[in-house]
A protein has these predicted regions:
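Macrodomain-like recognition of ADP-ribose-binding/processing modules
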Residues: 1-160
Length: 160
């Protein structure tokens, strides 16, 4: 079941936070930057994972560490070079990544997930196009899914 909330996703009480990234993402803007600052080990492990496994857009990778679990949904094209910015997101990649998220939730036995407005910041997609796709994959889940449709830094959302 999805509950739309407003607030700071980093303050979520959900077992995992899901957000959109690109393979080999630099985590230098938006929510990714905040996650990099909050969980520096996650970013280091993410870079290692990308170098070892070369994930493709549409995949998902979960990181578990002290303080939380972060689900990285590969919704964007990778950067063309080591120093360039990631490519744009696509609704096809969002579809595939959400399918992988549902599998991860089941495999990991997660009891709640917070998810950001996927692919609409750096990814460049329109929220009105992405939101129904999120609902199509996650609305039927039997666990709470907190959709952070509006971000307000420092504000704890009313998840319950």
């Amino acid at each position: 079941m999805i509950k739309e909330v407003s607030g700071d996703i980093l303050m979520s009480q959900a077992q995992a936070i899901a957000h959109g990234v690109a393979p080999n993402d630099h985590f230098d803007r938006g929510l990714a930057l905040s996650l990099r600052e909050e969980f520096p080990a996650m970013y280091k492990d993410f870079r290692h994972y990308c170098q070892q496994f070369h994930p493709q857009p549409g995949a998902a990778w979960i990181w578990s560490g002290v303080g939380g679990r972060i689900i990285n949904l590969f919704t964007q094209e990778p950067p063309q070079t080591t120093h360039s910015h990631p490519g744009r997101a696509s609704i096809i990649h969002v579809n595939h990544a959400l399918r992988e998220l549902v599998k991860l939730i089941d495999k990991e036995g997660l009891e709640s997930v917070a998810i950001s407005r996927l692919a609409t910041g750096v990814g460049g997609l329109d929220w009105e196009e992405v939101k129904p796709v999120i609902y199509s994959y996650l609305a039927s889940l039997l666990i709470p899914v907190y959709l952070y449709s509006n971000f307000t830094k420092g504000l704890k959302a009313a998840e319950k």
